[in-house]
Each structure stands twice: as structure tokens, then as C-alpha cells.
Amino acid sequence: MNIEELNNDELIDLYPKLLDQLKNRGIIRTKNIIGELGEYIAKREYKYNPNLPELQLNLSSTKNIDATSIKGERYAIKSLSTKQTGVFPSLPLEDDGVVYFEYLILVIFSKDYVLKEILELTWKEFLCFRKMK
């Protein structure tokens, strides 16, 4: 098998052996493999769906905001392979009236990291469904 001839989805399927190649191709940027794959897949799916805005991934250091639409809408992207997503440690416990992002994209994987579905919540929907830290 020539690893250079694999497409991105094949690389993702082989991820335990291919972390370096994934980084070289710009698919992941950090060691947070699940989060990085979720961001990559969200960006890809939004790009190819004419009903959704194209997303630009932000710098890894941007607090709570993973991507921005061409209209300036801020997106948080969370990936999960269980029934719970990660926490937002920089968000206050109580609603302080500040909108920290307009949309939350949930990229949901199976336990084998196969994409199951992508969900999008507004900020208000996120506030209704989130669990406290």
C-alpha cells in the first residue's frame, strides 16, 4: 500500500498509523485527534452543502470559537463518540447574557470513529440543552 495515494477518508480510517501524515496534509493541527477530525469534517461538509455557509477554521488558540462563516458568524465545533460532548471551561456557569458563539456544530462519531451525523444548534438551543460543569 502506498500511503501517498490514499484519500483523506482512507487516512482517517487508518488513523492510529497515520497521525504524522494527517498532520502533514493539514487535516489535524494538534494532538486532539477527535476534535481535529470533527473540525475538518464540519468544514468539508459545510463547504459542499449549498444550504450551509462555508467555514474558515480559526487559530487553535481562539477561545470557544473554532470557525467563522463568511458572514462573520462564530461557530464552536465539538466532536463526540459517546453520548456526552466536551465541556466549555471558559464559559460561565450561569447565563451572563453574552453570546459566545452563534452556532454549535456537533460532529458525532461511532465508537469506531465513523461519522454518524452532524448537528447544528443555535446559541439559545445550546443554553437549553447544556449541562453544567
Language model features with spans:
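Nucleic-acid endonuclease domains
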Residues: 1-74, 78-133
